[in-house]
Each structure stands twice: as C-alpha cells, then as structure tokens.
C-alpha cells in the first residue's frame, strides 16, 4: 500500500479506487450513524483529507475517541468525495492510532479562534494551527525561491560567520560571545576585562550582518549572496523588530546603485510570483482570515514598475503634502514608516526606490556622492509596510572609506581586512539587505514580526 502525502492524495494525480496510506494528525472529527469523519492533515498543504471510518472496523470505538491533535495512520481506498469543498477522501480499511492527546480539555491547540499573543506562549505547538501551518509553508516557499533565483542568475552562496569581531553597521548594538566566568572576570592592569584570556583571545560578538564578509567574495567571484541568521541587541519592543532574524544579502561587482535597484526589483517580483504559483491554497486562507489583499497586493506589486525618487525630492513632497505626521520631516532626518507609506501608498501608489540619502544617517561603507553630502544608498518601499529592502553602492575608494570610518569613530586597524579590498584590485560594487522575516510579514499580511519566525527572540523573550 502506497504511503502518500495529503497534498498528493488531493491533487487528483493518483488513480481513483487505488489503495493509499496517509500519516498525520487529526484536525477535527465528527460522527454520524456508525461513521466517523476524520479530517487529517500532515502539513504538506493547507487542506486536510477526510478519512471515512465505519463501525465495521475492529477499533471503531477507539476511533470515535480521537480528538484534535491525535496522530494516526489511515489506510484505505482513495475515492472522489461526495461532500462539498473537497476533491477526494479515503474510505478507511484501517485506522491505527499512533499517539493520543493526553488531556483534550487542556490541550492548548483547540479547534477555535486563538489570539496570536496566546500562540506565542505556546510557540512549540502553534505550527499545528491553520495560520502557522500556512505561514510556515509560505516561509519555506520564499526561502527556496531565494536560492533558486540566485542560482539561476549565476550567484554563489557564501556562508558568512555568525561569530565576528566587526560591527558591520557601526551601531554598537551587538550580542557579546564569551566563555569567561561572569562572576570572576579576568582583569588587565587598568582594571578592564582582559579579553585576551577569552576563547578567541579577543572580544567577539554575534554578527549583525554578513555584508562585510560577503564583499570579500564579491570581489573575487563577481556575484554572491549570503542568507543566514543575524542578531541585534536593540532593546526594542515594537511589532517590527526581532533580536534574531535572517538576512538575505546579495553583492554584485562592477555595479552601481542603478544596477543594485534593478536587481532588487527583479528579485522581489520573482519571489512574489513563486508564492502565487506555489502556495495559492495558503494565500487564499490568509486572504480570508488575515489580509483580504494578500493575493491582490502581490499581483499588483509584480505588475507595477518601480518608481525612483531622490531623498531630497521625497522630503519636499512630504513637507508639501499637507498631511500631519507624528514624526518631523526635515532634510537630514531618516524617513519614518509613516513617511514611507505615504509616499508609496498615497502619493505614488506603487513600489518606490528612494535614493541618495544624507551621508550622516547611513552606514560608513556607503559610497559618498560627488556633492559630499549624500551617499549612493537606496531603500525600496512597498505599499502596506514601507521599507522592505535597504542597499547601497559600496565605497570603493580607500581614502574616502578611511575618512568615513574616522567620521564614525571606527578604528581602521580593526577593519584592516575590509580595507584590503580597496588596496588590491578595487572595483565599484553594490548590494542590499532584505530581512527575511519582514518579507514574510509582508507576504502573509501579519501584524507582528514575531509571528513570521518559528521561535521569536526579542527583549525579555527567549523561550523554547
């Protein structure tokens, strides 16, 4: 007897009347006149398959006691369903109970509405819900599409280090990595902590970005990307921030900001097309329960050409909009989410690439423009969320990079390896960063980024 996934069984590609076996968990059960109708899911798709068991089965009394969350193996004949909303069902010849739910009354995942706040408290069980099953499959689809896009376009995937000595953003919000005894810290003659006695012989941290490391490979392999976990010790309790998240960071050699923007547009549209093509069932559920525009917004995004606007012009538009914003709009201040959303939703009505930001609000590695006041930076703004991608052309001139590092108070000797790229065959190059969880939030229409990752890490929250 063939073991098949629920997705395969429902797809209509198996012979009707053939014997199949499915393995999964009970979503719901209802009984009627000697019959038990068991909705079984295995996570392969959104829809469950109905297993129909009758009272001729020797363990029918046991089957009737099944509750949501119990695991089973069902064997039987695959037939067209007589009920509405389902294509096929299984007429069971056997149902073996593999695992019972200890106490159905206290089982946290009940077949009823549950708030996201409650589900975060049981994050180890929430993938069993319809919502988090859908989010997880979409997250997987996006991750697979990321690698596929870059592979098809000639990029090499680079595994950048998680433990580092460098602050790629220059913000200082990093998690320290140490094996020193926190109760009896070794001290040097000045009384400072003696990190030479630590595991790596120096101060080390969890990475905030793989960009600096991946640039090294860009300047040898031309087109590269990294896709991995990053960490920010930012004491932020908003719905938009995580302490641990995943970043996608491509880097292209012999490229300027315009080429960087084109890559970002092609990349996002490829990802959204993949989700529409591969996860229509999950998007349909999200459109019904979470975000009614879940499908329409992705289609609109794909079909709309990106608008490009200079930061200076964006500030003027915002100042002349007549709209009262919570945060001030002045040249030299970073744009806030409310400003970004006004530009992309109310004024332009499609994705926007804002370019050439004031140099003092952007990172030290961004290329200084000829005006000496701005850098070749970009933010891609999407309707409904604001910034979704941040990128720049990198500073390839050693003297300018050194001046920028001095301006930011960074020790150039500490970044000597990064400066080497500008000493040996330097070329113009560019790249961007896309927070993977922010992408999942946008696609799924979630209101809190903590629901876009399996086990959220945030200030005061590191369970599981």
From Swiss-Prot:
Asked if RNA-binding is a keyword of the record, the answer is no
Query: Which CDD domains is this protein grouped with?
Result: AsxRS_core, EcAsnRS_like_N
Subcellular location, in the record's words?
A: Cytoplasm
Q: Which reaction(s) does its UniProt entry say it catalyses?
A: tRNA(Asn) + L-asparagine + ATP = L-asparaginyl-tRNA(Asn) + AMP + diphosphate + H(+)
**Source species, domain of life:** Bacteria
Q: What is its EC number?
A: 6.1.1.22
Task: Tell me the GO molecular function terms.
Answer: asparagine-tRNA ligase activity; ATP binding; nucleic acid binding
The text of the family note is: Belongs to the class-II aminoacyl-tRNA synthetase family.
Subunit architecture: Homodimer.
- According to UniProt, the name of this protein is Asparagine--tRNA ligase
Which species is the source of this protein? Answer: Xanthomonas axonopodis pv. citri (strain 306)
